Curated annotation (Swiss-Prot):
Keywords: Amino-acid biosynthesis, Cobalt, Diaminopimelate biosynthesis, Hydrolase, Lysine biosynthesis, Metal-binding, Zinc. This is Succinyl-diaminopimelate desuccinylase. One of its GO terms (molecular function) is zinc ion binding. Catalyzes the hydrolysis of N-succinyl-L,L-diaminopimelic acid (SDAP), forming succinate and LL-2,6-diaminopimelate (DAP), an intermediate involved in the bacterial biosynthesis of lysine and meso-diaminopimelic acid, an essential component of bacterial cell walls. Its EC number is 3.5.1.18. Zn(2+) 1 binds at H72, D105, E168. CDD domains: M20_DapE_proteobac. It holds the Pfam family Peptidase_M20. The gene is dapE. Its cofactor is Zn(2+); Co(2+). Pathway: Amino-acid biosynthesis; L-lysine biosynthesis via DAP pathway; LL-2,6-diaminopimelate from (S)-tetrahydrodipicolinate (succinylase route): step 3/3. GO terms for biological process: diaminopimelate biosynthetic process; L-arginine biosynthetic process; lysine biosynthetic process via diaminopimelate. The active site is at D74, E139. Binds 2 Zn(2+) or Co(2+) ions per subunit.
């Protein structure tokens, strides 16, 4: 039986590390010690210039397939501490819930992964293949010195990963309802529209950039970028700010500025979207400045038999038929696309990053069973599924 006590105890210990991105605050060393005691070979690597980020890669066993559990130990800030029912970095178990910053995103999944792996190794000494972990402390921030760098290092060492399970919170209503197999891209825009300053009583002597930028933004909002496809919803533009830096009520300002974001599917590249945006703006003005930055591009995982087998496994363990999805924000899954097939599967995402973040203990146990049975499925020739 997979130990409920172990899952909860590991989660409580992980929450106690105030690992606000990109500082792991000792969490990487804690996980390293756990893995070493279990017989893993573990490498801890630090990357970065102005600051160093700790990452670990550990493996147990040998040969193929290499089933990799991946995740991040860093969390977002707790926000207003006084609004929390319980201290955010001191996990509190109350009735059927555990509260704490990072419980959902994603220390709960890491505790479930560790518990599942330790139980599997203790009960199966004749499995074929390798079990590995890739854990970073740089996902919630810029993600420059975490998974991306670690995968490059792993590849240079000659390690091949055959299938990756990333424990991001993917489910919406019940554990088992959603498996992420890709992600949309994200591109940010900073638009400045230039007009001509003047007195509000003499608009014919000025050019109002506010009127121009409103027309531009309305044209974006009122039209579809695309219709989406089999795996992706339509690309979506959201205006996040509009500003003139003008508090004087009788002045038409010279500059209006807006920031907006497009979450986009694999129908477009970020370069194509930039041209679409420019063309739209130039229907109204040519006197503008546009800056853009693309943090991540859309991707769809390699649709290997591992992914379809995992989907069937989730259905069998949870009794819920999961849907493949590419919705939500960006994640480190993008970095795996050139190295292995990958699924993202974890806890419910409804409480991620929120005040009083919590998860249900039953959900942790269910998630742990899925991870355990994935190892049985992929590493044991005569696997038997656990339901407890």
């Amino acid at each position: 039986m997979i130990s409920k006590k172990l899952i909860i105890e590991l989660l409580k210990q992980l929450i106690s590390f105030k690992s606000v991105t990109p500082n792991d605050n000792g969490a990487i060393d804690f996980i390293t010690n756990l893995l070493v005691k279990q017989g893993f070979k573990v490498y801890v690597k630090e990357f970065g210039q102005e600051y160093k980020v700790k990452n670990l890669y550990g493996y147990f066993g040998n040969g193929q397939p290499n089933i990799c559990f991946a995740g991040h130990i860093d969390v977002v800030p707790a926000g207003f501490i006084e609004q929390w029912k319980y201290p955010p970095f001191c996990a509190t178990q109350y009735k059927d819930k555990i509260y704490g910053r990072g419980v959902v995103d994603m220390k709960g999944a890491i505790s479930a992964m560790l518990s599942a792996v330790f139980c599997f190794i203790d009960n199966n000494n004749d499995f074929n293949g390798t079990i590995s972990f890739l854990i970073t402390a740089d996902e919630e921030g810029e993600a420059l010195f975490g998974t991306k760098k670690m995968l490059e290092w792993i590849n240079k060492q000659g390690h091949k990963i055959d299938f990756t399970i990333l424990g991001e919170p993917t489910c919406t209503d019940k554990i088992g309802d959603t498996i992420k197999i890709g992600r949309r891209g994200s591109i940010n825009f900073d638009l400045k529209v230039f007009g001509k300053q003047g007195h509000v009583a003499y608009p014919h002597l000025a050019i109002n950039p506010n009127h121009l930028i409103v027309k531009i933004l309305n044209s974006f909002i009122g039209s579809k970028i695309d219709e989406g496809n089999e795996f992706f919803a339509p690309s979506n533009l959201e205006v996040v700010s509009i500003d003139t830096n003008n508090n004087i009520t009788n002045i038409i300002p010279e500059i209006a500025q807006s920031k907006f974001n497009i979450r986009f599917n694999d129908i477009h590249t970020n370069e194509q979207l930039l041209e679409i945006v420019k063309k739209n703006i130039e229907q109204f003005t040519t006197n503008y400045d546009l800056q853009s930055s693309c943090r991540s591009r859309p991707f769809l995982a390699k649709m290997s038999p591992y992914i379809f087998s995992f989907k069937e496994l989730v259905h069998k363990v949870t009794k819920i038929k999961p849907e493949f999805s590419t919705s939500g924000g960006t994640s480190d899954a993008y970095f795996f696309k050139d190295y292995s097939p990958i699924v993202e599967f974890g806890l419910l995402n409804t409480m991620a990053h929120k005040i009083n973040e919590y998860c249900l203990i039953n959900d942790l146990q269910t998630l742990c069973r899925v991870y355990y049975n994935a190892l049985c499925l992929f590493l044991m020739s005569n696997s038997k599924f656990r339901t407890n």
